[in-house]
């Protein structure tokens, strides 16, 4: 038995380095002003997919992501770890999407890919923390869904057996294929990049990532696998009104950058006088009563 697996992955801003230019005037994320990383829980999802690929010979794993051309790096990171292919949804008409528009775009792409057995993604992205996209994709495709997965244990008789977190413990469930699964950050961590695969795919790019002046450009004709799939709204037969800002009823009004400042401290000795003074100060400021 072989499986066709699609991993939903996202290039996200590194939220440890959010500055004053993080948002645009329209209330969308200014991704060009922020360092970008592979969404952590999507790496957990990728690991589950790669384990299934090893468990069921002949299976394939593809990375599906949406973003600007530089998001092609997410596909490369997947290829370096053992994925077989990838698709980048990139089009100005996809820009500014909330979870509803994002899930619509991903669902139309999955329909174009066709005959998918499992769609696996991280529980949520660190830039939005909504945990909505996976379930929304399942709803739009009319597929079964399992959330908060810790491990995809086996595929047997057309069903996936999944161990998932619940309040106060874990449960094991079965879900008929095809199924959408979202994976927790506490699941098995992603394997490191494979050196041989890095050498094989380091020049793998989408057409919009290239300038045409790369010294390795002649390799593209010799090695077709170095050209990654790049799809626009038209390529996936999408409705422009349901994509990007046009299809996004959610709008971010403001984002505030909170700066924590240390207050002045003082050292209190253990003398009776200092202790009495401290208690009086706390009472006066109504910190204790």
What are the roles of these predicted feature ranges?
Residues 1-289:
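N-terminal glycine-rich FAD/FM-binding segment characteristic of electron-transfer flavoproteins
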């Amino acid at each position: 038995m072989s499986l066709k697996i699609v991993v939903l992955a996202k290039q996200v801003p590194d939220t440890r380095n959010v500055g004053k230019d993080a948002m645009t005037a329209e209330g969308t994320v200014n991704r060009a002003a922020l360092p970008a990383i592979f969404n952590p829980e999507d790496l957990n999802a990728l690991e589950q997919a790669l384990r299934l690929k090893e468990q069921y010979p002949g299976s394939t794993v593809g990375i599906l992501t949406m973003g600007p051309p530089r998001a092609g790096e997410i596909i490369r990171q997947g290829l370096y770890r053992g994925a077989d292919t990838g698709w980048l949804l990139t089009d100005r008409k996809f820009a500014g999407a909330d979870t509803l528009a994002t899930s619509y775009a991903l669902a139309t792409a999955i329909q174009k890919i066709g005959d998918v057995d499992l769609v696996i993604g991280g529980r949520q992205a660190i830039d939005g923390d909504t945990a909505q996209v996976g379930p929304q994709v399942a709803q739009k495709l009319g597929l079964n869904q399992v959330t908060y997965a810790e491990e995809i244990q086996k595929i047997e008789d057309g069903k996936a057996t999944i161990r998932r977190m619940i309040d106060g413990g874990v449960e094991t469930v079965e879900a008929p294929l095809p199924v959408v699964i979202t994976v927790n950050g506490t699941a098995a961590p992603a394997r490191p990049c494979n050196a041989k695969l890095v050498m094989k795919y380091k020049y793998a790019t989408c057409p919009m990532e290239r300038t045409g002046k790369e010294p390795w450009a002649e390799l593209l004709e010799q090695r077709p696998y170095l050209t990654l799939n790049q799809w626009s709204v038209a390529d996936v037969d999408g409705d422009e009104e349901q994509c990007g800002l046009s299809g996004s009823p959610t709008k971010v009004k403001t984002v505030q950058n909170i700066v924590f400042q240390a207050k002045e401290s003082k050292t209190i000795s253990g003398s009776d006088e200092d202790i009495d003074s401290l208690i009086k100060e706390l009472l006066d400021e109504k910190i204790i009563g």
